[in-house]
Amino acid sequence: MIKHNKLIYLLLLSPIVIANSNVEEIVTTGSLINNSEKDASPVDVVTREDFENFNILNFAEISKFLTSSSGSHFQTNALEGVDQGMASITLRGLDHSSTLLLLNSKRHTFAGTPSNQGQGYIDVNIVPEIAIKQIEILKEGATSLYGSDAVAGVVNVLTQKDFEGFKLRINNSKTANYSQSDKSLGLLMGSNYKNGNYVFGLNILERSALSA
């Protein structure tokens, strides 16, 4: 009877010994440097309501209302250079390739032609102003996250993905002496389905020459 008890005892212990042999060592490395978990990068948000209040005709014109922007590189009526009709937003007074433009938090390809200085940039005119939901502007360098094209900051454009219906906007504006005029047409339409949706946006801007 004693021999049988010893055999049962060994059988019960054997699985426990095997399980313990598979345990791996875990090493946790920490830092003693004090920091605040509430620290955040400075981000400006421009909503759809802000766009209506600014009364702007295209995305590039938003740069006139950003405190961290050096303006937009806009050459609609230029007579020289290779990038007429294109536009880019630059932050902190740096060149065009130092500000990263994201469309719905995703990268986009550069414009087909470089700037007059040979720099590659994203043409913001590809984004219909009427389809923009809001814009997020990161006002400091983010090269550790996005690379060297985010030295000056990041501009993230969010579009109206869930728009349903039809929207048409026509605008005609002139200078005080009628020497220059802007005519714009904006179209936005969308519909939601059971398994998805679609949104179509279009902006057309015709700007006449400014008489000196």
Residue ranges and their predicted role:
Residues S41-K64, I89-L94, G120-N125, N172-A176, ...:
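Short, polar/charged loop or turn motifs at beta-strand boundaries
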Residues K106-K139:
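Short acidic/polar hinge/loop motifs at secondary-structure boundaries
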Residues N35, K64-R107:
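Extracytoplasmic beta-strand/coil segments of soluble accessory domains associated
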Residues I33, S68, H108, S173-T175, ...:
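Structural signature of outer-membrane beta-barrel domains
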Residues F59-I62, L66, I89-T90, N104, ...:
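N-terminal periplasmic accessory domains that precede
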Residues E25-F54, A60, A111-N116, F166:
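N-terminal periplasmic "start-of-domain" segments of outer-membrane beta-barrel proteins
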Residues I62, L100, E136-L138, V154-Q160, ...:
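Predominantly transmembrane beta-strands of Gram-negative outer membrane beta-barrel pores used
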Residues M1-N22:
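Cleavable N-terminal targeting peptides that direct proteins into the secretory/outer-membrane pathway or into
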